[in-house]
């Protein structure tokens, strides 16, 4: 296992404005509304990422396509750090305003949806999904559909997944971090296993359960319990560890220039500049491989005994 694979991405919160009203959205831990990250901070973030050879930068919000300069931002990042794996997470609201050149420059595109059912679309994200699906079809190989599983969409989940597969998209399923409804997760996992077979655990920066369909498209499940298999060095001695709903899946850079690896912002840096904060915090996000393998091997032993 390459330990570098376990280091999380640098996530740039480009703005805090969003067109959607998803009750489960954690807003990347941000409580400030209508704020945009200045280009100067974006530049510092990219410079730090290049210095540390961070493998992946993710653009998020809010809704990042609400940035009228999103094309310029993507171009800037790729010019300054061509080797970086650059992704964006969007609900597709203004995807039609994003240039083809930008879509080509992006290495990964994550489209967040809740359902294809009109009442649910109106309730949560208020986006005509036919538009982003049509735009992203030529980029299917680098597009993943993110779906948060809730009571509202669980009964139609397999049909939603299959429709995404029909477009050639991979699918990531997630669960509400705060509620962490074990009964819902168990019910959904049982249903998906009957349809797609047993899922295996894959160890990335966020551990996931994964299976493939007949066309070798990925179906990944991000469950809080599985994510917690991986404990980062910075978390081990943190007095707030028990209060975390999400174990670190990214180092977040916020529009006001503060940097934190956790949604609750308990862990911050004493450094002044954005650049120095990233250089200070990111190296602390490693994983104790002895701990990780110990957990995995204990799990294997318990399976043998049962």
PLM regions: where:
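N-terminal [4Fe-4S]-dependent radical SAM core
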Residues: 1-12, 21, 53, 209-210, ...
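Canonical Radical SAM [4Fe-4S] cluster-binding loop centered on the CxxxCxxC motif
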Residues: 2-40, 52, 261-262
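Conserved beta-strand segments that form the floor/walls of ligand-binding pockets within enzyme
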Residues: 9, 13, 26, 58, ...
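A short, flexible beta-alpha/helix-coil linker loop
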Residues: 28-32, 116-118, 178
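Radical SAM/AdoMet-radical enzyme domain recognition
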Residues: 39-59, 67-174
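A C-terminal junction/extension of Radical SAM enzymes
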Residues: 154, 158-159, 163-259
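Flexible mid-to-C-terminal extensions adjoining Fe-S/redox cofactors in radical SAM and related proteins
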Residues: 229-306
């Amino acid at each position: 296992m390459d330990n570098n694979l376990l280091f999380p991405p640098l996530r740039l919160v480009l703005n805090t404005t969003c067109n959607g009203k998803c009750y489960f959205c954690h807003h990347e831990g941000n409580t400030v509304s209508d704020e945009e990250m200045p280009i100067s901070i974006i530049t510092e973030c990219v410079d730090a990422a290049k210095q540390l050879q961070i493998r992946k930068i993710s653009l998020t919000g809010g809704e990042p396509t609400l940035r009228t300069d999103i094309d310029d931002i993507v171009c800037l990042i790729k010019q300054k750090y061509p080797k970086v794996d650059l992704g964006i997470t969007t609900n597709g609201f203004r995807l039609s305003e994003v240039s083809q050149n930008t879509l080509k420059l992006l290495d990964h595109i994550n489209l967040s949806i809740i359902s294809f059912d009109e009442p649910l679309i109106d309730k949560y994200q208020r986006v005509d999904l036919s538009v982003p699906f049509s735009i992203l079809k030529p980029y299917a190989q680098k597009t993943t559909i993110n779906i948060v599983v809730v009571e509202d969409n669980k009964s139609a989940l397999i049909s939603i997944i299959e429709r995404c597969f029909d477009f050639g998209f991979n699918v990531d399923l997630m669960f509400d971090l705060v509620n962490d409804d074990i009964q819902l997760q168990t019910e959904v996992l049982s249903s998906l296993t009957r349809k797609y077979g047993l899922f295996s655990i894959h160890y990335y920066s966020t551990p996931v359960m994964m299976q493939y369909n007949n066309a070798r498209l990925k179906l990944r499940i991000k469950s809080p319990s599985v994510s917690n298999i991986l404990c980062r060095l910075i978390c081990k001695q943190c007095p707030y560890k028990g209060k975390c709903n999400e174990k670190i899946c990214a180092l977040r850079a916020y529009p006001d220039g503060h940097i934190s690896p956790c949604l609750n912002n308990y862990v911050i840096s004493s450094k002044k500049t954005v650049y120095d904060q990233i250089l200070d915090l990111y190296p602390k996000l490693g994983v104790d491989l002895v701990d990780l393998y110990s957990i995995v091997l204990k799990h294997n032993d318990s399976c043998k005994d049962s």
